[in-house]
Amino acid sequence: MTKSSRPQSISDSVSVAGSQGTLDDLRARVASVPEAPTREPVDSRDEQAWSYCLRLLTSRARTRAELTERLARRGYPDDVSERIMDRLATAGLVNDADFATQWVQSRHTYSGKGKRALAAELRTKGVSAENAAAALAQIDGEAERSRAAELVTKKLRSENLDDGGIKAARRLVAMLARRGYGQSMAYDVVKNALASEKDRRDVG
């Protein structure tokens, strides 16, 4: 298959936490897919499951496991779910590797999540260990540290440091831990940021 003829993937058309424009792109992508198969007939259960998945995908991108779970809740048997998932994948509407990549980029950039938290979120969504590892590899140690420092620096501006910053440091380390940053990195980032903030206030 040539590059120009390949199915459009999720990453081509939608960001997991992107703008309204990218959501509109996903909806347009879903709308362009026929409601009924074009090559061979299927039973009504397949058609119903297919339509249901398309409706779910108009709100946001989803993993294969998420859609399979939603179909199971509706009482669809495994063989129906498997056929629908394969068809969605062929249409470029379900791609767990693309989903994981977009999820990590978005949650790290906009929500400040560390790699541990991101790994847990991907597991919850049914992303395989292989796809999760590939997506998380986008964030190297320096990038993760830099994002943690941004979060801490922003919070420190409004902190009371009358006690030398002891209470503030505890709160900030706890905040980073909740966002999925390792303890060692959290302590180091907070220590450096606190020293810089004290210097800034002394000069001011």
Curated annotation (Swiss-Prot):
Residues 1-44 are annotated as: Disordered. One of its GO terms (biological process) is regulation of DNA repair. The keyword Isomerase does not apply. Its main location: cytoplasm. One of its GO terms (cellular component) is cytoplasm. Residues 1-22 have a biased composition (Polar residues). Keywords: Cytoplasm. InterPro entries: RecX_HTH_1st (IPR053926), RecX_HTH_2nd (IPR053924), Regulatory_RecX (IPR003783), WH-like_DNA-bd_sf (IPR036388). Pfam families: RecX_HTH1, RecX_HTH2. The keyword Cytoplasm applies. Belongs to the RecX family. This is Regulatory protein RecX. It comes from Mycobacteroides abscessus (strain ATCC 19977 / DSM 44196 / CCUG 20993 / CIP 104536 / JCM 13569 / NCTC 13031 / TMC 1543 / L948) (Mycobacterium abscessus). The gene is recX.
